[in-house]
């Protein structure tokens, strides 16, 4: 209340006829500043995730990524590309998950290095961040999807579940995922 009275008194002294014309703070824009992608594939990437020839109704997870100590962005963009072998069935899905970890405990009790999801139930304790949906019947076509994931922990591992009726292509590095930090930037 005192603040309003003081502001009113200042307005009267300065001859300002309306409190609405007083700007308390300058407007600013909020941008994003994408960082360096953390990549996952069979080889030659930041971390290994064995996607080559991933069979139908099976899953894998990638090696655990360490974002580093201190303040780190929690918002990440994921983008995954997959190539199936055979004639695709439109509408089938490949699921993308994330396992958070504090360095001691990991969602789904996933290990620190590349591994397999031993059962379909292993997905229950992971965070589903999105899907890549088969959108055409043409075989050997790469399909890509992307989305946003909230990853507030220092460590994380991505996981992929092949829910289609086909294996991923039996060629190294034709399927991959990338996770890019998207920290906000105040202007």
Question: What do the predicted segments below correspond to?
Answer:
Residues 22-44, 155, 160-187:
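C-terminal interaction-tip segments
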Residues 27-67:
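Terminal (often C-terminal
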Residues 1-7:
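Bacterial N-terminal signal peptides that target proteins for export
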Residues 130-156, 160-164:
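Beta-sandwich interaction modules
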